[in-house]
């Protein structure tokens, strides 16, 4: 009995090993459009796919970011300026992509553009603080996807949406975690709808990697700004010691983050080039060994764990 079980497990492992390594043919003829290529995951993925011979269409927010990327890549790579919060910018970029891909369609759409601030305790913020993050991370991603979808459908291609472990476990307030939960939900519904057209949708869920999103300096500046704008009543409830401890934790974030971004971009590349891409990719050991298991625990256990490890306001009961 045990021998048969071991044999079945071994056979399954062997089949899975070969299945995940099957690669799509004629990659050099396939176009991939990537948002957020000024820095971080976006610029690294663009360079990675360019080295592989794919035709990369890289969207950057600034001309400086676009120029720096062009200087590090081959003549195959093309850049366009895109602000995902502006409809007219998305329309212009979509027309630009159409002119490049022609009748082939767009093989890959990678929604990578994102921001993390303002974030912090919810009652330190105003409605526009939430809206600012949601406009980029969720609504912008949705509008880009809807605009590019006819091109992706024509190629029977791939949509790769960058979420986060914060799309599974909400550790802090503000628009970031909300937006990533939204990315997960939108991607799930999109995957089921597009399966009828041969289009595959993958979600990337990175742990903590050192990018602009996790920059200690940026997060500390954001936290201080939120503290300064909140009411005296809220500042009294939380207290100066809470703020100091909060900033101290944020200052240590750079050291906690993984500096090797290829752990994420390799997942993106697999989602674009594999014959059998996964539905979800947990990038980073912290994602695989902590945040993913944490997301499957009963809510009361997660709440208890976070209660005992989180900072307490000065006026906490």
From Swiss-Prot:
The keyword NAD applies. The chain crosses the membrane at residues 289-309. Keywords: Endoplasmic reticulum, Lipid metabolism, Membrane, Microsome, NAD, Oxidoreductase, Steroid metabolism, Transmembrane, Transmembrane helix. SUPFAM superfamilies: NAD(P)-binding Rossmann-fold domains. It is a single-pass membrane protein. One of its GO terms (cellular component) is endoplasmic reticulum membrane. Not glycosylated. Its EC number is 1.1.1.105, 1.1.1.209, 1.1.1.315, 1.1.1.53. One of its GO terms (molecular function) is identical protein binding. It is an enzyme of class 1 (oxidoreductase). InterPro entries: NAD(P)-bd_dom_sf, Sc_DH/Rdtase_CS, SDR_fam. Pathway: Cofactor metabolism; retinol metabolism. NAD(+) binds at residues 33-57. One of its GO terms (biological process) is 9-cis-retinoic acid biosynthetic process. The active site is at 176 (proton acceptor). Oxidoreductase with a preference for NAD. Oxidizes all-trans-retinol, 9-cis-retinol, 11-cis-retinol and 13-cis-retinol to the corresponding aldehydes. Has higher activity towards CRBP-bound retinol than with free retinol. Oxidizes 3-alpha-hydroxysteroids. Oxidizes androstanediol and androsterone to dihydrotestosterone and androstanedione. Can also catalyze the reverse reaction. The C-terminal region plays a crucial role in controlling the activity of RDH16 and its required for endoplasmic reticulum (ER) retention. Belongs to the short-chain dehydrogenases/reductases (SDR) family. This is Retinol dehydrogenase 16. The lineage of its organism: Eukaryota, Metazoa, Chordata, Craniata, Vertebrata. The gene is Rdh16.
């Amino acid at each position: 009995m045990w021998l048969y079980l071991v044999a079945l497990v071994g056979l399954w492992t062997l089949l899975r090993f070969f299945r995940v390594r099957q690669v799509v043919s004629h990659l050099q003829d396939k176009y991939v459009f990537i948002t957020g290529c000024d820095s971080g995951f976006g610029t690294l993925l663009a360079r990675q796919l360019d080295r592989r011979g794919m035709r990369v269409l890289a969207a950057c927010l600034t001309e400086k970011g676009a120029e720096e990327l062009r200087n590090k890549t081959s003549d195959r790579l093309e850049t366009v300026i895109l602000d995902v919060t502006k409809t007219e910018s998305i329309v212009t970029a979509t027309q630009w992509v159409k002119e490049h891909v022609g009748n082939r369609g767009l093989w890959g759409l990678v929604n990578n553009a994102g921001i993390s601030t303002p974030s912090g305790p919810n009652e330190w913020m105003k409605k526009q603080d939430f809206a600012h993050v949601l406009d980029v991370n969720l609504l912008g991603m949705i509008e880009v996807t809807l605009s590019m979808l006819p091109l992706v459908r024509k190629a029977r291609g791939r949509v790769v949406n960058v979420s986060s472990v914060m799309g599974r476990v909400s550790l802090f307030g503000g628009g970031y975690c909300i937006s990533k939960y939204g990315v997960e939900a939108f991607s799930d519904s999109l995957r089921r709808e597009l399966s009828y057209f041969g289009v595959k949708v993958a979600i990337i869920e990175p742990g903590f990697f050192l990018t602009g999103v996790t920059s200690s300096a940026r997060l500390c500046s954001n936290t201080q700004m939120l503290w300064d704008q909140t009411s005296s009543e809220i500042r009294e409830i939380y207290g100066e010691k809470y703020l100091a401890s909060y900033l101290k934790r944020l200052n240590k974030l750079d050291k906690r983050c993984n500096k090797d971004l290829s752990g994420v971009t390799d997942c993106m590349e697999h989602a674009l080039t594999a014959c059998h891409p996964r539905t979800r990719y947990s990038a980073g050991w912290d994602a695989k060994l902590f945040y993913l298991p944490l997301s499957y625990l009963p809510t009361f256990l997660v709440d208890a764990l976070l209660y005992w490890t989180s900072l307490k306001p000065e006026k906490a009961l």
